[in-house]
Curated annotation (Swiss-Prot):
The gene is mycn. Residues 406-434 are annotated as: Leucine-zipper. It comes from Xenopus laevis. One of its GO terms (biological process) is regulation of transcription by RNA polymerase II. This is N-myc protein. The modification Phosphoserine is found at S231, S233. Gene3D superfamilies: Helix-loop-helix DNA-binding domain. It is found in: Nucleus. It holds the Pfam family Myc_N. The lineage of its organism: Eukaryota, Metazoa, Chordata, Craniata, Vertebrata. Residues 138-162, 188-267, 310-365 are annotated as: Disordered.
Length: 437
């Protein structure tokens, strides 16, 4: 732009002396719009500017499809820069000025709407360049258009009153929502559902929306710092209004284009599918809770130990049968084969009682045998024959002493027997000697 050529690098270098960086570092010298730390501290942390973009098609004189630059091109650029700093209450061009410039209000609104999606200083620069291109083309005579199929979009008309429905500007959201400047109060732009990939325009006029969207590299600007701050506030207001539209439509979006591409049918389907699902989930949860409570009720009654058990009557009938079985003779019980074990508690109790009864019988027999043996032992001890109340310990002691005495007597008798046998042998030898003599 012409504002960039008139800048003096020496003055820029002098303005950057109070910065925090040393003199030998020319980190910010390449940025013509860099400000000292007193104005705005955030501008010191901006990224390095990229090289300027190539000139647009409107600026090329050799392009057969684009007219040459008019003589008052600088005036139109200055007018576009002033357009950005106007207050929202100002009526731009009084309703008929757009027709004189060859632009319809919807076209300008569409430019600003589609550029409001980009935040930062690059959005203002792209917007200013797009408006200047439109103004330069509007001042020249339009060339005859080439016939095109009905599906292709038609360029913007010269008159500001009539608005074509096939214009790409009509494929946007209502401009009054995000554009703060009041144009003609009586006119309103109708909107149509936007398509994902609109067909290219076949007329000589290049759509400004494509130019603004294809500009992905930041450009330099010739406006002052006051204009930049004012455009930042306008962009913030536009972004807040777009966020309010997102909240009203209740759609989760990632980008603004995705929200505009979505149709009203998808919105209604989302709200309809979500609400009955919640009601169905609530009803199903309540039904499941009722079923669980009904199933758990008998369990609580069974585990309530304080309440009377419903099986008490059947258990009380079992003890008389046990008594009858215990009264049967012992021989009969020995003859009857044992029943197989069952899982019922009543049969288990009966088997346990029968086992205990057999054990008691065997224990009683053992005790009787032991008593009888003690009585027999007492009878064999001479000292305890007449003592019927002798204790078992006394019987055992006396019996032990009596056994020891018997062993001593046996030894004595054995020695006497040996002596007698020797005596017998001597007598026999004596008899034989007498016979031989």
């Amino acid at each position: 732009m012409p504002g960039l050529v008139s800048r003096n690098l020496d003055l820029e270098f002098d303005s950057l002396q109070p910065c925090f960086y040393p003199d030998e570092d020319d980190f910010y010298l390449c940025d013509p719009d860099s400000a000292p730390p007193g104005e705005d501290i955030w501008k010191k942390f901006e990224l390095l500017p990229t090289p300027p973009l190539s000139p647009s098609r409107s600026g090329l004189h050799g392009d057969p499809l684009s007219p040459g630059l008019p003589g008052d091109y600088g005036d139109s650029v200055d007018w576009a820069s002033e357009l950005l700093v106007l207050p929202p209450e100002a009526d731009l061009l009084g309703g008929s000025g757009w027709g004189e410039l060859g632009l319809s209000p919807c076209n300008v609104k569409s430019i600003i709407i589609q550029d409001c999606m980009w935040s930062g200083f690059s959005a203002r620069e792209k917007l200013e360049r797009a408006v200047s291109e439109k103004l330069g083309k509007a001042s020249c005579t339009p060339e005859p258009t080439i016939p095109h199929p009905p599906s292709s979009t038609v360029g913007s008309s010269v008159s500001g009153r009539g608005v074509d429905m096939n214009n790409p500007a009509a494929h946007c959201v209502d401009p009054a929502v995000v554009f703060p400047f009041p144009f003609n109060k009586g006119e309103s732009c109708r909107t149509a559902p936007s398509s994902a990939n609109p067909p290219p325009c076949t007329t000589t006029t290049v759509p400004t929306s494509t130019t603004a969207r294809n500009c992905t590299q930041p450009c330099t600007s010739s406006s002052s710092s006051g204009e930049e701050s004012h455009s930042e506030s306008d962009d913030d207001e536009d972004e807040e209004e777009e966020e309010e539209d997102d909240e009203e439509e209740e759609i989760d979006v990632v980008t603004v284009e995705k929200r505009r591409n979505s149709s009203n049918k998808s919105v209604t389907s989302l709200t309809i599918t979500v609400r009955p699902k919640n009601t169905i989930l609530v009803s199903s949860k309540t039904a499941q809770n009722e079923v669980i409570l009904k199933r758990c009720a008998p369990v609580h009654q069974q585990h309530n130990y304080a309440a009377p058990s419903p099986y008490v009557e059947t258990e009380e009938v079992a003890p008389p049968q046990k008594k009858l079985r215990n009264e049967l003779p012992r021989l009969v019980k020995n003859v009857v084969p044992t029943k197989p074990k069952s899982s019922s508690p009543r049969n288990y109790d009966s088997e346990d009682s029968e086992r205990r009864r057999n054990h008691n019988i065997l224990e009683r027999q053992r005790r009787n045998d032991l008593r009888s043996s003690f009585l027999t032992l007492r009878d064999h001890v001479p000292e305890l024959i007449k003592n019927e109340k002798a204790a078992k310990v006394v019987i055992l002691k006396k019996a032990t002493e009596y056994v020891h005495s018997l062993h001593a007597d046996e030894q004595k008798l054995l020695l006497e027997k040996e002596k007698l046998q020797l005596r017998q042998q001597q007598l026999l030898k004596k008899i034989e000697h007498l016979r031989t003599c």
